[in-house]
Structures are given as structure tokens and as C-alpha cells.
Amino acid sequence: MSSKGDLSKCRNIGIMAHIDAGKTTTTERILFYTGKQNRIGEVHEGAASMDWMEQEKERGITITSAATTCFWNGCRINIIDTPGHVDFTVEVERSLRVLDGAVAVFDGVAGVEPQSETVWRQADRYDVPRICFVNKMDRVGADFYTCVDMIVDRLGAVPLVLQLPIGVDKGFVGVVDLVEMRSIIWEEDSLGAKFHYGDIPEGMLEEANKYRSKLVETAVEVDDEAMSMYLDGQDISVSLLKKCIRAGVIGSNFVPVLCGSAFKNKGVQPLLDAVVDYLPSPNDIPTIEGVSAKDPDQVMQITTSEDGKFVALAFKVMVDRFVGSLTFVRVYSGKLTGKSVVLNSSKGHTESVGRILLMHANNREDISEVKAGDIAALAGLKKTTTGDTLCDQNFPVILEKMDFPESVMELAIEPVSTADQEKMGMALSRLVAEDPSLKVFVNNESGQTILKGMGELHLEIIVDRMRREFGVEASVGAPQVAYRETITKAAEVEYIHKKQTGGAGQFAKVNILFEPLPPGSGFEFENKITCGAIPKEYIPGIQNGLELIKETGIIAGFPLIDFKATLFDGAFHEVDSSPLAFELAAKGAFREMASKAAPVLLEPIMRVEIITPDEYMGDVIGDINSRRGKVSEMQDRHNAKLITAFIPLSSMFGYVKDLRSMSQGRAQYSMFFARYERVPENVVVNDVKR
């Protein structure tokens, strides 16, 4: 996105929240009030411009992050609207990685919901400054003050209340601005475009003064001059107060909290003011660190400047039917023009940039260049994938990559005809390039193609996109749980691979210690060979053999995780040894280890949060117990109960129908991956073997 003006007038922000909190509705109002579009697109009508995919329009949810640009008070705002459903949390992860700030939207009735916690932790991981917007204040049961308390209790954040709601439920008409100490009332017949300032309602003066005092007391703590003035009893001016709030937001000392109703067109303009006043510009972000592509131990500092060497991070790949592959990038330094050649330092090859595009959802506008602080889409890149660094060929640097969560569900898919076979291969390769959380592999025993994803909805969307966008007709199996395996005992194995077929043979001997690791550790390989028992050129073959065979597991063909393999001895033959021989020896040692290391099956455990009316609580808890679940917490929530439980994923298929049935459609739930746990010995796992 081409810069216009200096970087201090630029904001790169994301809109994030739990599903149905009103993220896309808020974004649509932002685009309307900033003049980006001349009509308001409603999500429930399938007309939201940011939800452009057919699946998004049909379901009324955001599936893929969409980028756009608008202007407010002379400031350029690059916005990424992210999904709220847990199955698409990868879209949030890669967006937050490249953003300077975020607006967290909360449902004024439900408060801080499970996915709100997930995206908040993601923002914590990348140190993204935030503003909170408590939405849906016009809804019956909306409670601004409870939401503020939940921001403390569930997110561990320090809320800085900047507004108070005027009126409740359908009587919500505006807000008290605690910074300027005035009221803001919106005119109903102007679609929220017109509003007026006034005095604070007399009945709210005492409360407003109390919250204003808290606001000033908290804000001045980040500025020595302001703190000194405050302690001396001097008034803090509005400009100084805003300066303190901005410094505190950028330093992650607190999070401003505003409120409104995006659907009823109230509260959006002050939210835009807060984005401009308090969220950081690219200039406010500390120097970005990377490592040298030539020497990974050498740390390199990248300063945000148009005059520096070009450095950008590819955070999203999208296939456009008219343009082909589009690579979304955040530029951290330098500038780039069309028809340029850049270095993909992550993969070690150059890429030719064809066109540079400014995006508004799925609409494109050609621009001549992109500069530091901008977000843009590049056409023409062939091999660049999510997380790759693009840079000047004379400045080979690699930025920190992104980590994506483990896939927990899989299904088998087969083309219905030979003609569909080739189309399916092409479709899956493109979808995998777009989506880092989608994994595709072929089962060696059955020959079936297996898709692995984040949940039922994720896989359902993938299959639907194959059919609609690529014309692939395929038979789809029922979703299956993605089990894992691990070992519970240490085992020392000596294995000799020896084969003589005339001429040069094969010989490799390895001594490997296999040990269990704590949950979440993954796989570790350590080479402790000394005195040249195995030449160093054969070590990669051993590690590669273990990397490959661990994916086939021991018990039922599921990947083995959370273990360490230590190579401590071995032998080689001057003529018959080779990297392949040692790879085969490592695989043989792994198979021999199976009978000694007490392998067990692991299953994904989900954190399930259920909100149910009090009268159905007994039935819901009884059902949780029948699913091998464990209730960990219960909280009161507006004449309802919030139940948090940990339940095996294998027991959750069809739960949405069962919950509706037992609660007459009044209960709802959210589900998130928590961890892997050992499958109890008394539990029979049906059809678990691949």
C-alpha cells in the first residue's frame, strides 16, 4: 500500500474477537464513515464487503483475513479484518505477526469469550498494543462494567476506561467521553453519520468524575512530568492526558476501553479517533530483529525507514483467479517498485515481482511502489510461502518466522474419477500454499489422500472450496481424530543394517538412546558421537531417517511425539557405508525400540466452554461426564452458567445437536484444542488404526 505522507500518519491495525462479537460489522461501519464505501454492507444479508468468499456470505462468518485501507483525520489506516472462529485462528496468528496495533471487539452481553482469550494471547506473544471496543451495547443484557471486570479477570489486562455508556439496552443513545468530559449522542436518522457533543447527563456526573479520576491517575504513571503535575495538584490538560494514554498503550501498560453499537451505528467515530490518537505508527515500533542469512548466529537490526535496504515479511498467500498467486507482505524497511527482483532469504533464491497491488478485500488496485510501514500484495512470486523473508539481494536477512498450532482433525478424500485426480492435486497444492494449518499426505497402506486441519468447519470449507473454485468432485470420509503416539520408557538400541548383493554392499551400525520428553516437547535429536565412530557426513542421514519414520508411529500409524533420540555410538565401513545405509539403520533402530519403550496412544483434549441456562446445568454436566470429560470451573453469567470442561475430541462429534436437544436450543458452546493426553487403557478406540 503506497505511503502518502510520513510514517507517523500511518496505522497498521487488525480487528480481532470471538465469533459473532461484531468484528466485520465494526469494520463495515469504519469503511462507511471514512468514505471508503458509500453503503453499509450487512453481514446477516451476506453483503459485507470484507466477507467476499461465497462460504463467508452463506455462513455469515469471516473465514479468511481481508485487508483494506481507509483515511481518518489525515491518517492512513491499513486494516486487516480477521476471523473469530477457532478453526481459522491461523489467519489471526499471521495477521498479528505483521500488525502494529489491534482493536479487540467484545460482545457487550457475552463479555470476554473463549476465542477472545485465544486471540488476546496471540497478541501478547507479538507484543501488539490494543484498544478494546465493547460492542452491542444496545442488546438486552449488555453490561459494560462486567465486560471491564472480565478484561481484568480473564485476560489479566489493565483496562483504562475512556467512555461510559449513556442508556442501557434499546435506550443506549451515546457515550460519556471521559477524556474531554462531554457526552456524544448519535442521530438515529443519519445512519450514525451525525452526532453532537453536549454536557454529561446530571445523573451520571458522579460516576463520570470517579472514572475520570481513575483514568488520570493510571495514565500519568507513564510520564514523569505528568505524574509530578498530578501530585502537585495541577490540572492535566487534554493534550497531555492523550500523550500519556498513547505512551501507555504503546508500552503495553494498559488497554483503553471504549463502547458502542456498530450495528446501530453508534460509537465508531470515537473508536477511529482512538486508533489515530493512541495506537502506534510504524515509527513507534522498536527496531525489528533478524538474523543473517549467511550466519544465523549474527543478529541484525532493521530500522523502519524508507531509506534503508528493502526487508519485508510474507504473511499470507492467496490464489486469485484473475491474477494468480498473490503474496501479502508487510514492508519493514526500504521500498520496492514493480518489475523488481528480490531475495527470498528463507529459501535462498530470488523472486521476480510482477505487479504491486493495493487490496480492498478481493478487489485490486495497481500501485507503483510500496514503502516501509506498508502492507501490499505482490503478484508474480513463484516459491514464496507464509513466513518467508523477502529482502534486498545485498542485505540477506531472515526475520522471525511464525508458529502455527497443531492440526487435530483429519479426513480421507478420493477423487470420483481419473479426470478429477489431476485437478485435486493442483487444488490441494494451491490450498496448502494459502493455508499453513492445512496438511495433506497419502496413507501408504490405503493409498488414500488425507487432509489434516483445525476442525470440522475448517475441513468442510476446504472441501467446498475444492468443489467450487477448482471443479473437483470427490468422495469425502467422515472426520477422524488426529491421534498421536509417544513412549513412556527409555530404551537403548543397537542396530546393524547390513546388505550384500554383489559389488558394493550396505553397512551401517547405530547406537541410539530413545527417551520420553515432557508433553509439548516434540522431537529432539542429539549427536554425541566422538572419536569419529560415524563420519559427520552420515549424521544427517540418521536424523532424516528418524524424522521420516516417526511419522508412521508404532501402535496405530500415528506420528510419534515428545521423545528424544540420542546417537551415542556406531560404526561404518569404508566402502559399504553411505547416507542411505545410515538412514535405513536409524529406521531399523526405531522399529526395534517399539517393543522396549512402552509406547502409548495419545488423544487431543479440548477445552470446552458451555453457556447454559441454570435449569439445564444438571443435564449438561451429566452429558460431559458421559463423554469422559472433566469439569474444571463453573461461573455465574446473567441467569446462566458458564461451564469450563476438558473433553476428548473423539467424544465431541455431533455435540452441537446433542446440546441443542438437551437445552431446547438455549445453550451454546465453544471448543479449543488444549493438549494431548494418554488414552485410558479401559477405553476402546474404534477404527483408530489408519
Curated annotation (Swiss-Prot):
GO molecular function, one term: translation elongation factor activity
A GO CC term assigned to this protein in UniProt: cytoplasm
Pfam families tied to this protein: EF-G_D2, EFG_C, EFG_III, EFG_IV, GTP_EFTU
GO biological process, one term: ribosome disassembly
PROSITE patterns: G_TR_1, G_TR_2
Keyword Isomerase carried by entry: no
Principal subcellular localization: cytoplasm
Superkingdom of source: Bacteria
Reported function: Catalyzes the GTP-dependent ribosomal translocation step during translation elongation. During this step, the ribosome changes from the pre-translocational (PRE) to the post-translocational (POST) state as the newly formed A-site-bound peptidyl-tRNA and P-site-bound deacylated tRNA move to the P and E sites, respectively. Catalyzes the coordinated movement of the two tRNA molecules, the mRNA and conformational changes in the ribosome.
Protein name as it appears in the record: Elongation factor G
Species whose genome carries this gene: Anaplasma phagocytophilum (strain HZ)
Origin organism lineage: Bacteria, Pseudomonadati, Pseudomonadota, Alphaproteobacteria, Rickettsiales
Gene: fusA
